[in-house]
Every structure is written in C-alpha cells, then in structure tokens.
C-alpha cells in the first residue's frame, strides 16, 4: 500500500500513520513542484565545502534513490530528494554513478534545473547571513532550548499504545523516539507557515527567493554535521522535504513561544488532512516523513518569516529555539537582526538540541548548568558557562558555546550519542554486537533424514541512560542482523535462511537444514553478524546426536546420554540470585564461567562433582569484587572433563 503523500512505504510503521496524511493528488503535485523548484535553486548555487552535487532527473521513491546512491559507494551528506544529493567530494569519482544520476559539473544538472523558472540564482540570503564572525553571545542572553515534551495527550498515548515497536523504525525504537542519537539518516521536514489573515493581520509573506535561501542555509548547516560525523567515522546524512504555503490563522512571529502550539496545530492539521492536538500531529508528521525517506530519525523545522521585523524576535523576546529531544525546532529568518551569526549557524545549533545536546552559552544564570547530564549516554555538560565560565574546568570553542560553526567539543559529541566510552576510537553505538539463540542446545533424532534446526538472532542494544527518560528510555540500535552462519564440526561456514526471506531487522528468526548424516554426535556452531560488521560476542552450539534406526533412544534430560551430563540454571529471568545444578560422573572436574554480551568474564568457579554425582551452587549475580551486575543477557559455560555445556541467563532487576 502506498499513500500519495503520507509515504506509506513500510507496512508496520504505516499501519499506525493515518492515511489521511495521503491528502489529495493536487496536494501531492504541489509538493512535487515545490521540491523541483527548491532543487533547481540548489543546483544553480555553490555546493557546501567538500561536497559535490549529484542530480537525479527522475522522480523515483526518495528512500530507494538514497539507497541506490549509497550502495554504489556515494555516501550522501545532505539530500533534497528526489533530485538533489550532495555527496563527499573525496572519493566521489572512484565509482560510477547509478543510472539516472549525474554530477552537476557536467552541465546536465544545470540544464535540467533551468527548465523551471526559479528566479535569479543569486537571490539574496536572509539578513542574518552576513559574514561569520565570533559572537560569544549569538542568542543575546536568551534561552533557546526548552524542556523535553511531556507525552501526556490522550491521542498521543493512544498512538504509543497502538504503535509499540514498529517495523521500519530503528531496532528498539518506538513512535516517540524520533531523535535519540545523531547517527544514521535523519529526515528533516522544512515547513513554511503562511498567515491567511483570519485571526492575526498578515504582515509577512514568503517569496520563492526567500524560501530558497532558507533551504540553502539548511543544507549548509546540516552539511556541517555530516562533515563532523565523517571525521569520526560515523555515517550521518540528512534528507530534506520542503512544504510551503501551509496556512494558519495566526502570524507566527506575532505569537509568543507559549502560544506556538496554536499556529503549529493549524499548519500540521492542514498538511495532514485531519485535526488533533499539536503534539500528536508533530509526531505523526515526523514519523510519516521518517517512513517516506527510509530514515532512522526525523525532525521538523518550522521556518518563520520576519525578514523586516524591527526586533527580529517573537513578542516574548525569543527567536530560534528548540524542544530538547525534538520533534521540532523553530527558526525565524531574522534572528535579533544578527550581523555575525548566520541562519546556517542557527539551524546547525538548534538541530543539536533535537538530539539532546544542551546549551553552553551565556548568560551565566541560564538553566543549562555545567553539572547537568543529558543524552543517550547521560553525558555531562562540562563546557557550559553556567554558573560561571570554566566552573567545571573547561572552556572550549563549540557551536553550542558561541558562534563557532566549525567547532564541535567532545562534550556535545558525547551528548548526541558519539561517545566512545571504551576508548577504542570507535563510537560505542556503531560497535554493538548481535546475539544468536538456537532453539535447542541438544538435538536427538534417528539418522537417515535431513535435519532442520531453528533459532533467533537478536541485535543487542546498549541501554538508554538518558536522564530525561528517567534512565528508562528505549534501548535502541540502528544496526540490523546481516546474516547467520553455522558450521558442523568446525567445517566450512553455511548460511542460515531467514524465516521472512530477508535479514533486515534487529530481530530475525532463521532455519538451517543439515544434510543426511551418518549416526554419531555432531556439534553445530552458530554465528550471527550485524550490519556493523560484527559478530556475536560468544558463539552458541547445538549438539546433534544421531542414532542408527534400530538403536534405542538415550536418556538424560537434554544432555548427552553417553556422557551422563546435564545442567539446570534458574530462574531466568532472575532478579539476581541464580541456582546451578550440574549432574556429571562423580569426581569430574572442570570450570564454570559467565560472560556478558561483550565477551567479558564476570564470574568463574572451580568445579568438582561429589560422590552423589550432583554439584549444586548459588550465584548472587555479582562480580568477584561484590559489585552487582546490571540487567541484561549473560552466557553460562561449564567445561567438565572435556565436555562443554552452555546456557543463556537473563538478569532483570
């Protein structure tokens, strides 16, 4: 099912997005025209530094176009699908562009762009786009980050309850997780409200030239973030949608921040085609855009026209501002008549708030103290000037500290999810591992027929420690299961088959069919690999025991009958204490070990089976030093007289 405008592309996600977002064919045509006009203007302008513009003359599905380019070896920094894609200049000539794409420099893009009259290519930028200088107070002592939204409305609670964990979202994410960390593809909807004069006098109107200048500023501001990410080995791209002429009864610049829900609700209700409260509409539209563009995250940018406003601010003195954690931010074209900070900078700054970065700038009586923590990893805001410059020992140039659009401090990096807590040079969120769970660790049957084994592979997300989620936020990974492999008795690797036909999500069921084997015992080793290129921390095994058709069945309660071994572990899940019962030949000796999902040993025992043939012991869920282990998945391995027994254990505190 594909709705004309709502982007009903991913079935699980769009089961919740109301098809009222599809609107009419005329609405869809208008949106396509706006995209073409904006793309044509970009094609006639200089590309951001370090990027090359790739033009697509077709109108294919935006997510498919982005995927085609990236599969061909062209990482996209910023895009305005379906026509404009900015790719990194370095290495861009080493691969062949997919069919239908061309570099702007070869003349084809310019020719295509000029088929539509869009005004002069050198249309003036907003007044705030003067040459960049250093202004230590680009917000002139005003707050621009407001507390996170409370998910309290009845319609929104219903959305959340119906949505759950939806197909098409990052693994573990839910409806309201629109910007948890800045890694992957981010959908950015630029919405242009237009007052119709019904309630407030219509004082400002968007012109095509002014609207295009905002889009160019957004491209440049977002390109900064993509460049920062590339320098850290992080894949980050922004896909932009443009929606102009969105009617509202109010003149947005004449309303206070406390009143902005009124005009936002007008704008989004007209766009979506149904009415609801502003908050529900914000998440509905953000999720629809996320689905259309095949993105992991989504942010709404409300551009406000006030180019000739004498004070360049809303009536309460605020100008550009954002809700911490999204799903939207607001940026007037004229921010307090600034002559040093560009509109590019304000967009670059505000989207960081959408991904949980805190301010660091003046005044020193602001709420963004250097002692606060934020973000997926609960990271400190140590570079803040609050309560005084250098109070927490740091004072560094940063785009959250002042007008430093080319500087990103390590504190902000960690707040938006780029933390490298293990110090190996790779951000933790792009080195997550999967886990693999065969349905059985022991399998017995009669030889003479193929054997089908089943199991599940699961991406293991790092726990979300965001304090604004009360440390109970959804644990999310943008990695997915890439493959499951198995080996029989250490032989060559074979590929397991995904039950749904494709390995493309964070949770996958699989089957593996062994050929006809002669009677005997075989060990099947399992490996799961994810899209990070990493495999499970500890391999899992299934012992297959095949007897001749005339041989009697063995006994042992899931253990090898010939060895007389069995292991019981429970309860699992456990709040902490776990009991182990090992049955083995009297006098058997060995070791018991427990590892976490990263392969680190957290517990160890020296084992000797007494004359009763049963060893029984209790573990309190603590490391040797006495520290309590966190909730999570753990792996038990018992090595006894040359045999290995493996079990899985879940601790849930």
Language model features by range: what are they?
Residues 27-167:
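Autoinhibitory N-terminal propeptides
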Residues 432-549:
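Long, low-complexity serine/threonine/glycine- and acidic-rich segments characteristic of extracellular
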């Amino acid at each position: 099912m594909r709705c004309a405008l709502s982007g009903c592309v991913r079935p699980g996600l769009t089961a919740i997005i109301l098809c009222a977002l599809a609107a009419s064919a005329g609405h869809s045509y208008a949106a396509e025209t706006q995209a073409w006009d904006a793309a044509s203007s970009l094609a006639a302008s200089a590309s951001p530094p370090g990027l090359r513009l790739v033009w697509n003359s077709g109108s294919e599905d935006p997510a498919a176009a982005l995927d085609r380019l990236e599969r061909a070896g062209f990482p996209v920094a910023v895009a305005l699908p379906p026509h404009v894609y900015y790719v990194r200049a370095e290495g861009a000539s080493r691969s062949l562009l997919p069919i239908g794409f061309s570099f702007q420099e070869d003349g084809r893009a310019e020719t295509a762009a000029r088929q539509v009259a869009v005004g002069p290519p050198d249309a003036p930028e907003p007044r705030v786009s003067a040459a960049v200088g250093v202004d230590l107070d680009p917000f002139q002592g005003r707050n621009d980050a407001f507390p996170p939204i409370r998910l309290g409305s009845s319609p929104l609670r219903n959305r959340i309850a119906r949505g759950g964990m939806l197909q098409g979202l990052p693994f573990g994410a839910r409806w309201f997780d629109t910007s948890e960390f800045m890694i992957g593809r981010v959908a950015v909807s630029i919405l242009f409200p237009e007052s119709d004069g019904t309630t407030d006098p219509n004082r400002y109107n968007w012109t095509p030239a002014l609207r295009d200048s905002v889009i160019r500023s957004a491209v440049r501001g977002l390109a900064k973030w993509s460049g920062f990410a590339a320098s850290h080995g992080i894949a980050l791209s922004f896909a932009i949608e443009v929606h102009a002429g969105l009617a509202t009864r109010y003149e947005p610049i004449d309303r206070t921040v406390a009143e902005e829900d009124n005009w936002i609700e007008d704008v989004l209700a007209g766009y979506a085609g149904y009415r609801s409260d502003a908050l529900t509409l914000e998440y509905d539209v953000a999720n629809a855009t996320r689905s259309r563009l095949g993105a992991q995250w989504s942010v709404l940018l409300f551009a406000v026209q006030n180019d000739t406003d004498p004070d360049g601010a809303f009536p309460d003195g605020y100008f550009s501002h954002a809700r911490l954690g999204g799903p939207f931010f607001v940026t007037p074209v004229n921010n307090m008549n600034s002559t040093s900070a560009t509109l590019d900078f304000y967009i670059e700054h505000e989207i960081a708030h959408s991904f949980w970065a805190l301010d660091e700038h003046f005044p020193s009586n602001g709420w963004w103290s250097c002692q606060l923590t934020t973000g997926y990893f609960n990271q400190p805001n140590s570079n803040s000037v609050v309560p005084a410059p250098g109070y927490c020992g740091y004072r560094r140039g940063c785009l959250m500290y002042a007008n430093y659009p080319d500087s990103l401090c390590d504190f902000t990096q960690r707040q938006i999810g780029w933390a490298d807590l293990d110090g190996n040079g790779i951000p933790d969120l792009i080195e997550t591992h999967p886990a693999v769970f065969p349905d059985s660790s022991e399998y017995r049957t009669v030889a003479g027929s193929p054997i089908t084994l089943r199991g599940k592979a699961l991406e293991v997300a790092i726990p979300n420690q965001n304090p604004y989620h009360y440390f109970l936020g959804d644990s999310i990974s943008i990695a997915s299961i890439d493959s499951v492999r198995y080996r029989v008795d250490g032989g060559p690797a074979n590929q397991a088959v995904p039950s749904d036909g494709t390995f493309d999500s964070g949770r996958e069921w699989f089957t593996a069919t062994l050929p006809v084997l002669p009677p005997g015992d075989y060990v099947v080793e399992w490996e799961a690999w994810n899209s990070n290129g990493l495999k499970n921390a500890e391999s899992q095994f299934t012992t297959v025991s095949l007897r001749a058709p005339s041989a009697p069945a063995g006994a042992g309660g899931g253990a090898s009958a010939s060895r007389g071994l069995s292991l019981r572990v429970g309860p699992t899940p456990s709040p902490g204490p776990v009991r182990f019962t090992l049955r083995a030949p009297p006098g058997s000796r060995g070791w018991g070990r427990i590892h976490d999902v990263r392969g680190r040993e957290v517990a160890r025992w020296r084992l000797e089976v007494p004359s009763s043939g049963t060893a029984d012991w209790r573990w309190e869920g603590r490391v040797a030093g006495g520290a309590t282990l966190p909730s999570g998945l753990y792996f038990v391995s018992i090595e006894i007289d040359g045999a290995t027994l493996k079990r899985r254990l879940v601790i849930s505190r």
